[in-house]
Amino acid sequence: MNNCQLPLSDVQSRQDHRRLDIDKVGVKNIRYPIVVKDRSVGSQSTTARINMYVNLPHQFKGTHMSRFLEVLAENQRAISIENLPKLLKEVKQRLDAEEAHIELDFPYFITKKAPVSGVEALMDYQVHFSGVMRGNAYQLTLTVEVPVTSLCPCSKEISAYGAHNQRSHVKVSVQFSQFVWIEEVVDLVERNASCELFTILKRPDEKFVTEKAYDNPKFVEDMVRDLADELTHDPRISWFAVESENFESIHNHSAYAFIEGGQRS
């Protein structure tokens, strides 16, 4: 019984003699409520999967995992994208680290109207924010994954009628000097696809999207090039990466393309 009153060993703080720094160590897949800026209504509450890491110098055996969760718990009413620099600074201080990383992955919802009937419904998009603080330097990367329709130009050209089309997932990552709305990235992708997707379509809407896709055929190469061209000419964007995966309807494989531009921090 008396042994229980002795100080508990801090194993993580012991010396490690392998002289190998660790770039990232921490916790993954923490589910937590967050608040995100919404262009239409001001803000939106959602649930994120959060990853938190720090670097670990070679002389330490381990990091103190519970301290990541303590930072979240102490800021549970104020976890937002705008608050990431504060959270990163606290993580660095609490774990005595030179750099800290926080990643947020969450569904984001936008109300969309069907193109003809005007029926409204929520559409979900997967969004990822990655914040890094090295010393006092802070960098934020926004990634948005947008599902769209792509229709093959070759299939349209060589066929007497019809053309194969499919759902595609387009992922756009940006670093920026001025604020960029999530909705802006979604709009950018959807206007450069053969056609955008909708949650609810009545028959007149279905006719519209079918014909629109047929009138706007796009290879996977076309989509990433068109997006990269617009991002290159946006003065707010310092770096971008664009990738598209087309889930081919006539093949048992996907088509894929990727473009990166600008200077990454």
UniProtKB/Swiss-Prot annotation:
InterPro entries: GTP_cyclohydrolase_FolE2, GTP_cyclohydrolase_FolE2/MptA. One of its GO terms (molecular function) is GTP cyclohydrolase I activity. Pathway: Cofactor biosynthesis; 7,8-dihydroneopterin triphosphate biosynthesis; 7,8-dihydroneopterin triphosphate from GTP: step 1/1. The record marks C152 as: May be catalytically important. Its EC number is 3.5.4.16. It catalyses: GTP + H2O = 7,8-dihydroneopterin 3'-triphosphate + formate + H(+). GO terms for biological process: tetrahydrofolate biosynthetic process. Keywords: Hydrolase. Belongs to the GTP cyclohydrolase IV family. PANTHER family: GTP CYCLOHYDROLASE MPTA. Converts GTP to 7,8-dihydroneopterin triphosphate. This is GTP cyclohydrolase FolE2. It comes from Magnetococcus marinus (strain ATCC BAA-1437 / JCM 17883 / MC-1).
